[in-house]
Amino acid sequence: MKKIAVIGTGYVGLVSGTCFAEIGNKVVCCDIDESKIRSLKNGVIPIYEPGLADLVEKNVLDQRLTFTNDIPSAIRASDIIYIAVGTPMSKTGEADLTYVKAAAKTIGEHLNGYKVIVNKSTVPVGTGKLVQSIVQKASKGRYSFDVVSNPEFLREGSAIHDTMNMERAVIGSTSHKAAAIIEELHQPFHAPVIKTNLESAEMIKYAANAFLATKISFINDIANICERVGADVSKVADGVGLDSRIGRKFLKAGIGFGGSCFPKDTTALLQIAKSAGYPFKLIEAVIETNEKQRVHIVDKLLTVMGSVKGRTISVLGLAFKPNTNDVRSAPALDIIPMLQQLGAHVKAYDPIAIPEASAILGEQVEYYTDVYAAMEDTDACLILTDWPEVKEMELVKVKTLLKQPVIIDGRNLFSLEEMQAAGYIYHSIGRPAVRGTEPSDKYFPGLPLEELAKDLGSVNL
């Protein structure tokens, strides 16, 4: 059994700490945020993640998991210290290491013996050595320690499963002793272990996320071409993805990636490349495609409706993906303001992310936790998040709620055949449009194309 302190009780810290406790370690999760620790002690989990609340409760009852604001005491009582604080994107696009530096300084000031200090946060190449120098200076060389990079690869919405069934453990360190300690810690996960130096471990996380983001932007560019040549991107993706060299994952066309990782990490990697004097044109294009994809779905809506001024639009999905309340870089946070700039009123649905989204979007949006209520008496519907409740909508019922049977689907949830049979005007991503049983100009008198371009050109992304 290892004694572990996890500094930072955000998404990564809380999930990692809880899973380390689950495999039999003594874990204390600590944070400077007193209200967050108070909530955790009272059994209130600050993030939504399937299975996390039950696992926290179980390990608290088994006395393997505790929470505290007393970070110095947690440091002194532990053998392994994980840094799992936020690394938000700075104004220049680089990762902001303010919290990492502060954690390293605190660790150095309270060392009382040999410790293994582990960076779990996603950090730029060179951060491990920076942490090492900060701890060394703050501790005044009184005690020995080692620094390890051990990046996380969990996905929001399936983080517990991803941690307990991890596909690999990456351990970066110049110390064989420290690497062996962290490798032993990961043995119960039965995952392949990759041992390397600090720099390579730090780069692995960025490279992995950038590659996945590249697959998403690639299939979205293919989807946009498919729309112009009459191809169906879902069939194209199937045909491409069955090639074992490529794989089917992350080849689902849509409105682009969001969340706390891909947008931040692709931008940070671009800055790392620039700092190293390398023009990373591929990642520049990945980011550009992702940003344009959000405008593309609004363009589709304008193509059907001519104008949304004075119209009410229902938006289904505020979280960046299902099974999370995370709205960081969520498509909805860009698309809803675009609709408002174009003069539309928005009724938005999300089962769990309304508190987080409303704090950003404000009170000009009507919010609903009932998917049907969000669509009642609206002129068109935009699907932005593939929540199960959206996938399972009764299309016959939806048609009675909408003023016009118009659905713009950013997640390709429905087959073209069922939408045609149900009589919808249905536009999705990278697939032929369904015109419905009535021409769209029955509902929307068309505007000249130059007017559509003028409307869309006025939108600020």
Swiss-Prot record:
Gene Ontology CC entries for this record: cytoplasm
Binding site for NAD(+): 3-20, 31, 36, 122, 156, 264, 328
Subcellular location: Cytoplasm
Binding site for substrate: 152-156, 205, 209, 250-254, 258, 321
Gene Ontology BP term (one): polysaccharide biosynthetic process
Induction notes from the record: By phosphate starvation, via the PhoP/PhoR two-component regulatory system.
Modifications made to the protein after synthesis: Phosphorylated by YwqD and dephosphorylated by YwqE in vitro.
Swiss-Prot/TrEMBL catalytic activity: UDP-alpha-D-glucose + 2 NAD(+) + H2O = UDP-alpha-D-glucuronate + 2 NADH + 3 H(+)
Chief location of this protein within or outside the cell: cytoplasm
Cited InterPro entries: 6-PGluconate_DH-like_C_sf (IPR008927), NAD(P)-bd_dom_sf (IPR036291), UDP-Glc/GDP-Man (IPR017476), UDP-Glc/GDP-Man_DH_C (IPR014027), UDP-Glc/GDP-Man_DH_C_sf (IPR036220), UDP-Glc/GDP-Man_DH_dimer (IPR014026), UDP-Glc/GDP-Man_DH_N (IPR001732), UDPglc_DH_bac (IPR028357)
Pathway membership, UniProt: Nucleotide-sugar biosynthesis; UDP-alpha-D-glucuronate biosynthesis; UDP-alpha-D-glucuronate from UDP-alpha-D-glucose: step 1/1
SMART domains according to UniProt: UDPG_MGDP_dh_C
Active site, UniProt feature: 261
Pfam families: UDPG_MGDP_dh (PF00984), UDPG_MGDP_dh_C (PF03720), UDPG_MGDP_dh_N (PF03721)
Domain of life: Bacteria
Other noteworthy facts: The nature of the anionic polymer present in the cell wall of B.subtilis depends on phosphate availability. Under phosphate-replete growth conditions teichoic acids are present, whereas under phosphate-depleted conditions, at least part of the wall teichoic acid is replaced with teichuronic acid, a non-phosphate containing anionic polymer. The synthesis of teichuronic acid is accompanied by degradation of teichoic acid and reutilization of liberated phosphate for other cellular processes such as nucleic acid synthesis.
Recorded family membership: Belongs to the UDP-glucose/GDP-mannose dehydrogenase family.
GO MF terms held by the record: NAD binding; UDP-glucose 6-dehydrogenase activity
Name by which UniProt lists this protein: UDP-glucose 6-dehydrogenase TuaD
Keyword Cytoplasm: yes
Function: Catalyzes the conversion of UDP-glucose into UDP-glucuronate, one of the precursors of teichuronic acid.
Coiled coil spans: none
Organism annotation: Bacillus subtilis (strain 168)
Key words, A-Z: Cell wall biogenesis/degradation, Cytoplasm, NAD, Oxidoreductase, Phosphoprotein, Stress response
Record text on activity regulation: Activated by phosphorylation; inhibited by dephosphorylation.
EC number: 1.1.1.22
